[in-house]
Swiss-Prot record:
Enzyme class: transferase
BP-aspect Gene Ontology terms: tRNA modification
Underlying gene: miaA2
Reaction(s) the record says it catalyses: adenosine(37) in tRNA + dimethylallyl diphosphate = N(6)-dimethylallyladenosine(37) in tRNA + diphosphate
Function of the molecule: Catalyzes the transfer of a dimethylallyl group onto the adenine at position 37 in tRNAs that read codons beginning with uridine, leading to the formation of N6-(dimethylallyl)adenosine (i(6)A).
Xref: InterPro entries: Dimethylallyltransferase (IPR039657), IPT (IPR018022), P-loop_NTPase (IPR027417)
Domain of life: Bacteria
Protein family per UniProt: Belongs to the IPP transferase family.
Pfam families: IPPT (PF01715)
Oligomer status and interactors: Monomer.
Protein name: tRNA dimethylallyltransferase 2
Binding, substrate: T10, G11, S12, G13, K14, S15
Amino acid sequence: MRPLAIIGPTGSGKSQLALDVAERLAGEVPAEIVNADAMQLYRGMDIGTAKLSVAARRGIPHHQLDVLNVAETATVARYQQAAAADIEAIIARGHVPIVVGGSMLYVQSLLDNWSFPATDPAVRARWEECLAELGVGELHAELARRDPAAAATILPTDGRRIVRALEVIELTGQPFAASAPRIGAAQWGTAIIGLDCDTPILDDRLAVRTDSMFERGLVEEVRVLLRAGLRDGVTAARALGYAQVLAALDAGGGAELLDDAREQTYFGTRRYVRRQRSWFRRDHRVHWCDAGATGPSDRAAMVDEALRVWRHVT
């Protein structure tokens, strides 16, 4: 059974559309949803990731949610293997897999069946020591000297990816980009729907979303997760919202600091949306839908369009 992937920037309505599509399909064939949001892999990271509660999932099975502790490191390779196994099992049951998320590398690794360059713990450890000693800025400069193209695509603050790029360059003797797969036919013949809308509309949604997260208890969620090991999490502690609240709490946790954390979360999410758009828009396989209008008739029309594309992929 051919999968459907629903991708796009944060706040575009992907989870809602996935539920609507699954419900529409229910009279014809059961559907199951596979998460492709890296931070929703973590147990307890609910408010800040806009994770659907069990009650909000409408009885539709969901996979790749709440599979990691916050102290564990999420990796694209591990996700790809686990999510692909979920999809294969869903197809074997005669059900439709619906992949939903906006984590760029996670989505593409799954749909393009990436193979990952080997890793060497000793080489990785040496570069991690350099990161600790020199700082992320100097290590990014080193990457720029060795592979300018890779440095241009990796944020100067993303120490983990900088270390990985330098490791791959050292092990393969080739530029980091040489190990990146090209966009080809989507695995399993997956139909890909992209949701987006005009920037002012999405910015307004992100503002409402950010305010709602803080009002619903994001700060307390971070406090609880700190007791579960959040500070030790390489990936979880860097998540948007969580990193900002953690920094505010470390600085004293006063109202002004938390207000600043809220503002930084909003602007950080806007920057992330720009990266998501840039990444996904280069994929010629995506059928884009305008998600600016959200009335009942608009939602029904998006379901119609998603199913039309899903039924006609060859």
